Amino acid sequence: METGIYIELSENDPREKNRSWGYVLEAPGGWTKHETGECTGTMHGVTLQILIKALGRYHKPSQITIHAADEWILNMLQNQLPAWEQNGFRNAHGEAIKYQQEWEQLAEKVKDHKITIAPGRHEYSAWLQDEMKRGR
């Protein structure tokens, strides 16, 4: 089944701060599900948390395209996650990577899916920004 996850943050400022977030799950036939909320964290940390939350809604192996403005997270997901997993989520110096627990959770969530990435703004960006402003 081919589906999409569309993630949006109220701000793409990399610093730790309180921010709103939202995601839309889109499935074949036009079915969608969305959720919004608020939390405190960095852009990368919040993007990881929301991605884990959205992937938690999948119960069957799927082909998923992940759309998000956080290009770094998407690139690490596609290109670095397997190496981190093999190295016990440690960097080249043997130190735990930043957001180690989140990356471990993400590795578990994506293992049964075929993931593709689409960095940048997406068709739900403006709508999710409006929903976040309304607090829905």
What role is predicted for each listed range?
Residues 24-27, 84-87, 135-136:
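Short, low-complexity, polar/charged sequence segments that are solvent-exposed and flexible
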Residues 1-45, 49, 57:
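RNase H-like nuclease fold core
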Residues 52:
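Glycine-enriched catalytic-core subsegment of oxygenase/oxidase enzymes
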Residues 35-36, 120, 134-136:
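Helix-coil modules at protein/domain termini and other flexible surface or pore-lining loops
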Residues 11-15, 55-132:
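RNase H catalytic domain
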